[in-house]
Each structure stands twice: as C-alpha cells, then as structure tokens.
Amino acid sequence: MKLLCLSSNPNKPCSVLKFKNTLIMFDCGLDATSVLGFLPLPLVLSTRLSNLPLWTPREAGDAQLEGEFKEANGRVFVDSAPEFCLPETGLVDFADIDVILISNYQSMLALPYVTERTGFKGTVYMTEPTLLIGRQFMEELVTYIERTPKPRTATRWKQHALKFLQLPSLDLGKPRSWRQLYSMQDVNSSLSKVKVVGFAEKMDVFGMVQVSAVSSGYCLGSCNWIVTADHEKIVYMSGSSTLTTHPKPIEHGPLRNADALILTSLTQTPLANPDTMLGEFCITVAMTVKMGGNVLIPCYPSGVTYDLFECLSGHLETTGQVNVPMYFLSPVAENSLAYSSILAEWLSSAKQAKVYIPEEPFPHAQLVRGGRLKPFPSIKAEGFTADFHTPCIVFAGHPSLRFGDVVHFMELWGPSPNNVVIFTEPDFNLAEAIAPFQPMAMKALCFPIDTSLSFVQANKLIRDLKPTNLVLPLQYTLPPPLQPHRSDLVIEAECEVQTFTRGSIVHIPVQRRYQRIEMTAELAESVVPVEVKCGLGIATLTGALHVNNNRCTLKPLQKEPSGSKKWNGQTPPKIYTWGNLDVTEFARKLDKAGFTDVKVENTASGMI
C-alpha cells in the first residue's frame, strides 16, 4: 500500500492511495496563497494601483521583463492575472485515477485541473452540500477573475526573475507549475462527473474495495472517508471538528481500529481559541460602528460566515445597534443564504429542530427580511448604491484581498483610521494580504476562527480511535517555527507514525493476508464435514477458482469427457489426507484388516 502526497499545504490536501490495484484520490485542494504575490484586481479603476511604479531587476538582462512587476511600499508584485498552486502533476497520471473522494467544499477547488483535459475517466464522490456549496465557491472565484481581466499576462518572470525576487509563498511548489483559473465551462464539465452520496452509504469500487462517508462536523456536508476491503480498513480524516456549531456532529465510531489513519487539515491557528476570537470579533465590530467607523470583513460565501452573521447580529441587539446595516457582497450571496436553509438534514440536531417548528435554522433569513442583512452580487448591482449608507459592516470576498469587491473597500476605506478590516479566515497571512495597500490608516486586525481539530483534540481522538498506523504531514510532528518550545503543538501517537511532504511516496505497512472467496451452492452441497471435536467440523473439497470483476468464486470442476484433448487420464481426488498419522493405531487397523507381520521402524526421516 502506497500514499502519494500531491500538496504542500496540509489544509488544502490532495493525495493518492494505491491499494488493491485501485488508485483513490483524497481531496483536490487548491492552494490560493500563491495569489499573494500578485497585484489586486480592482472592480473600480484604482488610480493608486494604476500609478504604482514599475520594477525591473537590474541583473535580469531581459527586456521582456519590463512591465511584469510593480512596487508597492517596498514590496514587489507580479502585475498579471493571479495564478494558483495546483496539486503535483508529475507523480501520478490523472487518467489512471479510479475515484476521487472529496471531504468538504474547501478541499475540491482544484477539481477541474484534475478531471479536465487529463484523460480522467473515473468517478468523483461527495455529499450533496459539498457539491452545491463547492459549485458556489468555484463560481465566485471564476466571476471575480473574469470580471476584472488584465490587458496582458506576465509569463517571463517565472523563467528569469525567481533568483531576483522574494515573492510570498514561493515554497508552495515550483511557480512554473502555477496556473491561471479555470472557466465555468471547466467547472460544469468537472462537476458532471460527480456522484452524490449520503452518510454511511457504501460504494463499490470495481469489486476491490468499498468507500463510505461519515460526518466530520466541520462544515455542511463535510465528511471523513472509510476505505474497506474484506480484511483491511483505511480511514482518511480531513477537516474535522468536535466543536458544536451548525453542521452535523462528527462520528467517531466508524473510524476506530483502522489499519491506517491518514490525518490532514488540523487547525491553522493552534494558539487561537475560536470562541475567544468570536467574542473579540463581535466586541470590536460593535465598538467600531459605535464610533462612526466602518468594518470590512473579507470572507468566503459559506462556512464560518453563517456563524458570524448569527453571533454578530445577536451581539448588536444586546448593544442596541440593530439599525447598523450588514452588507453581504458575493456573486453567489443570495444562493448561499438560500441553500443554507434547505439543507436541514445535514445540520446539527438543534438546527434541525427549528425546521420542524417551523422556523428557519439560521437567523440570516429573518435578518434579510428585516433589512438588517442585505445580500448583493456586487457593488455594481442594481440598487446597491441607493441602499448603501455608513457606518456599516461589509462582508465581501475574497479573503486574499487580491480580487472581489473587498479590493474596492480596501481602497475606499483605507485612508481613514476610524475604519477597520478584520480577518477571520485563517488561510491568508494578514501582513502579506494588506501589503499592496500600504501605507494605510485603516486598522487591520486578525481574529482567526478555525474550528478544525486542535493538536490537543487530535491527540485525544487518535488515542480513542486506536489505529495501527498513522500517516500525517511532516509539519504536524514539529512545533511551530515561532514557538519551538511548544511540544504540545505536535501530534504524538503510540502507534507506528509515518510522515509525508509534497511529492513524497509513503509505504504503509498494511499487508494483505487474506482474500475473501465465495463458494457456489452446488459446491457447498458436496462438502461433507467431519467432526474432529465438539462443535468443530473439517472438510476437504476440490473446486476451480474463478476471478471475475475482482471477485473470487470457488465453483465445482467442470467434467471433461474421456475423449477430450484436455483430459490427461487423471481426476482430482475427492478427499485429501490431513492432520498427523497415529502410527500405532494405523498398525493396529492393518493387523485387524488381515495384514500380518506388520513392523514399524524408526528412521531419520520418519517411520516405515
């Protein structure tokens, strides 16, 4: 059994398992931190960004590099459409992948790169919420990029400028493998290969293994995957949470006693408590708008954003600020709010109970009807300008601050110290994200809310699950670089532990010792057991082993006619000898049968 790691980011995982002649891909995470090396794409023309000075490395000696870089506050950025870090493509041929198992909508954004124009002919499995919300994430990304096209594409910097530049996140893999975003046509074609599954539903993969999904508690429809053969069990854990939020809670039972546990997507902010961060977030927002300032919250169109709506609206009610408007800007804003209310079966029991009252599981439906939460597809949408007034709270994408409506508000509110931008998504470093907007007077704060398993929670869970082998990213066995003394921020296990990095191949010591074989009824009728002791019978049999669609079946031998060319004049025995021979008893029975002068002699090789 082998595991091939295709990603350098544990929270945007992608790996391939080779097991029983099948290739199973776990997740297709798209690492977007590479976009931090590019200039933002403003929806409205930004004079400041347009007038940034060009930058060319003196030692480059390549005239074609001119115009590919711009400098902002001492930092250099690529002036081109942003590019994304793909999963490793040289380790495995995507055409050979049999199935792709997606854990959650955050881990599927690279799917079109894997399934389109690669010869992929397999099946993609995911839950219904993952498909619906994942499509929204992809649609939002495509819309952000396509509505702000760049007049030219910078390409020479990859070949010539890396030795002169220290762009952010260059350790994500070779920038030459970075790619611009796919199209909606690619998205639709890729998602047409998806088969929706439910929790605990078992899918057969070519008769070799079965795969099933169980709730992971991280987000709507998120799951952990269980791969089972007749005598082996592999568990893949990605994006799991033991916190009580809006998704259905994590299921532990089916994950226990695995031959191998593959663990990814632990918290990116091990020093930040989600509840504490949420409380500080609400207090800061309320204080800012009370002082007449505006609050900008870069966000995704789903996930923690729902919890922010709920907690923030409740806090503003307690502080008497119910008239402060909240704007939700995303090309998929209205669909996102609608889907969250119709996917009741995937919610926690507390949220499900509200559906049967009947009542909306989330308060944002009531907030929209009451005019407190206002969804718009864009700042250019009809009615937005007339409705917009300050002070206000704006939720907008993208959290990288490189594209989306958030770029406009960074430019608009940046000069005022009364305003604040608050980062709650842990995917992007605050300092690198705001770098092209510096210098700015607006305050930038970070209250990361990551509900993924912490290291303490993960260690406790591993002790409970008792896997034989644990396979995880190398980063999880080392303390954070900024806290080298924090030995509690690593994964420790009593079982065999193996680590992986991007491009590595891990050999998991799970040996196949048994194979399931089915016996036909006809052959079973010919079996005559002999009881060797109370409750235990043994029988010998003769049959032919047939393998079809990776299933083994034992059938009676076909009778060959005596004149057939295949017949060799011999027939297989109907019974076989077994066990140890009692020589004394054997001699006694020979004597009883009329054989006289029976003698037994001991020799070096046995008895005669």
Regions picked out by a protein language model, each given a short descriptive name:
Residues 1-608:
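Acidic/His-rich, metal-assisted hydrolase cores and their charged scaffolds
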